[in-house]
Amino acid sequence: MQSLSVSPLTYTADRFAPQRRKTLRVRVGNRWIGGDEPILVQSMTTTNTKDIDATVFQTLELAKAGCELVRITTPTQKDSECLEEIMKKVRAAGCDVPVSADIHFQPRAAMEAVKWVEKVRINPGNFVDSKSATPRDYDDASFASGVQKVYDAFVPLVRAAKDRGVCLRIGTNHGSLSDRIMWKYGDTIEGMVESALEYLRVCEAEHFGEIVFSMKSSNPRVVVQAYRMLAARLDKEHKPYPFHVGVTEAGDGEDGRLKSSVGIGALLLDGIGDTIRVSLTEDPVHEIPVAKALVKLCDLSRIAPVPSLAESLDFYAFHRRKVPLLHLGGLAIGAREKIAVGAPDPGAESIPKGERRLEWTGTHDSHATRSIPTVWEPRSVDFAIATKHSLVALASSRLFSGLSDLPANLEIQVEDPAHLEKLPADVLSLPHVYWSCSISGEAGDNPVARYRHLNAWLARKGRPDPIILRGRSDGTPEGNMMLAARFGSLLVDGIGDLLYVSGPAGTKVCMHLGYDILQAAGVRRTKPEYVACPSCGRTLFDLQTTTQKIRQRTAHLKNISIAIMGCIVNGPGEMADADFGYVGGAPNKVNLYVGRDVVKKNIPEMDAPEALVNLIKEHGRWSEPEA
């Protein structure tokens, strides 16, 4: 297994003053992707493509909802042949939305599809090579032979696309890397990137540049790292092709929206992304307002820059920031402790005390914002100061003179990174300090960059102090998504030891939002994790109904992940991290997995949810719901 070499920071010009990545402008029908064009919102039909009228109807409904590009699955050549009639009917209805064909396994289907649509997506993991149940071994010669096979199979499609003015998307899926790529690069983001670049080299050999890339996974952290690495590689080689960004198999409801916000939002906030799709296990029309909201929320033109500092982070792998243990009353944060969750003091509000409990209320025995207390009791206390006020007064106060001798914690809340340089030197000698940034929620606020600046400044000062991520949501779905995008961007980089959420919705709602964001970012699990694909024409059972049934039976379980996948295209790969898998194996038949291994096959759809419950019980992972 080999590793790719990427310079420490090339995926964006400035992480503290983000601008949209400069890309080539690619034509798709009557629309453009990349360059200075607005970020384009797209979705995918869930109908059987051979049901031409149903597919046409859903395409028109998506266009009415504001979808700017519609993707249709074409798993076979017969499905691709249906595109001719579908396109005629869509255009006859007065709809000019560009259409993309989604291809897996079938170069012949791609050659048919390219005749009728404006864009064709291929998956490098299975267009020529594939993943087998028993991975084969390779050597350098057989690997090189595989590269030649890619050229031979792909070049006819490239030439046809070039002749017809059709765009190609080279769309890698983490769950379907081929055995050949896995042999050389392993199950890594390097493998995802190199898998795509093999196909780019074929395009370049044919002088074809109407290309869009994607790097998808059901894990938002993998998504962010893979797109960053691809951007770094392409920009280093002066090949700034545009990106289609998305988190695949995000699921449904608020969980699906938060997971998408963590992955897509974190990238958009760094200027990465030219077209997006939010993959929800719902009616695809529901995806459009979510995607449009993300684009609006992550508008970089409204975000103020923050002074840059050199960072010592690995932007392509997750490493949680190393900090010492700190006790906030009865709560331990930092070190190897789980990232904690805080919310405002509940007062008389009833708060649960189970796996999801209120771990910190964020209150201090004294909050020195406008004045510094000069007298205090010699006991363990928790103080806070805000940097916009006079810190010189802190250094000269009687409060400060005793802090270093007592088990007192001091929270320093940074409102402007420039204030950090004004901190008295003696403050940095205090033993029990933790840091946070205020978040105003106002237009132009850039908390992600301020937290990055704080983290870099602490590293430069040799202060591995805990950092509290403070955020506020107005309680709307959009407010929650914005918070997930901001927090997710930081959590992906290993920044944050406690997540504190406030807002008008109340302590319980804020607390659960904090836990949900941590789970969406993949850093702490406190309820079942569902990896559910959004359905498409390949789906072999009713995904939406089935997902709800499985949720109802298993929502009380703890520390378990369940994948619900409509077919075997990406199912076994994308659910690799899941404990149990529920995958369509044939029409109305389901295969059940434990980890990567299929253990039960061809279970009738009606019986499969109960069979999954029994499988969980057999492996000792079941518990009865609490009364």
Per-segment meaning from a language model:
Residues V41, D102, I170, F213, ...:
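Conserved, mostly hydrophobic/aromatic
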Residues T74-W116, A348-S350, L358-R379, V392-S397:
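N-terminal active-site wall of soluble small-molecule enzyme domains
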Residues S43-T46, D51, K64-V90, P124-S145, ...:
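Glycine-rich, proline-tolerant flexible connector loops at the mouths of alpha/beta enzymes
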